[in-house]
Design a protein with these regions (language model features):
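Alpha-helix-loop-beta-strand connector modules within alpha/beta enzyme cores
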Residues: 1-19, 51-73, 109-133, 176-181
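Short, electropositive alpha-helical surface patch
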Residues: 1-10, 85-95, 144-158
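Hydrophobic faces of well-ordered beta-strands that scaffold small-molecule active sites
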Residues: 9-15, 33-35, 72-74, 94-96, ...
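Active-site beta->alpha loop and helix N-cap motifs at the rims of alpha/beta catalytic domains
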Residues: 11-52
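Catalytic cores of alpha/beta
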Residues: 19-28, 79-89, 133, 137-151
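Glycine-rich phosphate-binding active-site loops on the catalytic face of alpha/beta enzymes
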Residues: 35-42, 93-105, 149-169
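Histidine/lysine/aspartate-rich catalytic loop segments that bind and position anionic ligands
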Residues: 40, 71-127
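C-terminal helical cap(s) of enzyme catalytic domains, especially alpha/beta-barrels
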Residues: 47, 106-110, 163-182
Length: 182
């Protein structure tokens, strides 16, 4: 709450679709929320929120956020079924889970995972969704990730904070921004 009160930038809250988190977000009033899996049962094979299986719960939370003027993103796998359901719900954004791509970066499956992300971004864009991406993005794979079409925002945390431990947060952010926008 202290961070929310003193912030000078946007605050994005990653949260599960629970009553407690919904109430917390409605009190906190962040700029945006990203709905993520709450437990192992809600995780699809690659790790995104299964909005098809949990559409009623996701719809309730999304509707509550919309009514409060809080933008909502759904953290999903780049799977057509998940994207199509996301478009039917009232969240204006999706965050495509890039973890499978990041995990396959040095493996044979990298190209196929990248193709999935590109196809997912295109499908989401055509469906009228704002496209974000995140999970496992780092200083090496960003050069390819940044070429995914229709990306509005990338959510990168771990690699920036890890680099900041040795060179400071200013250098870590500056370097990532240079790699994102050469």
């Amino acid at each position: 709450r202290l961070l929310a009160a003193s912030r000078s930038t946007r605050l994005n809250l990653e949260m599960a679709c629970t009553l407690a988190m919904t109430e917390f977000a409605l009190k906190l009033k962040p700029h945006s929320v990203c709905l993520v899996p709450e437990s192992r049962e809600e995780i699809t094979t690659e790790g995104g929120l299964d909005v098809v299986k949990h559409r009623d719960k996701v719809a309730r939370v999304t509707d509550a956020m919309n009514a409060a003027g809080i933008k909502t993103s759904l953290f999903i796998d780049p799977d057509p079924e998940q994207i199509e359901m996301s478009a039917r719900l009232t969240a204006p954004w999706v965050e495509l889970h890039t973890g499978a791509y990041a995990n396959a970066y040095y493996a044979a499956g990298r190209a196929a995972e990248f193709v999935r992300l590109v196809a997912g971004a295109r499908l989401a864009h055509v469906a009228g969704l704002v496209v974000n991406a995140g999970h496992g993005i780092n200083y090496i794979n960003i050069t390819e990730v940044r070429t995914i079409p229709h990306l509005h925002e990338l959510n990168i945390g771990h690699s920036i904070i890890s680099r900041a431990l040795s060179g400071g947060i200013d250098e870590a952010v500056r370097t990532m921004k240079q790699l994102m926008n050469p």
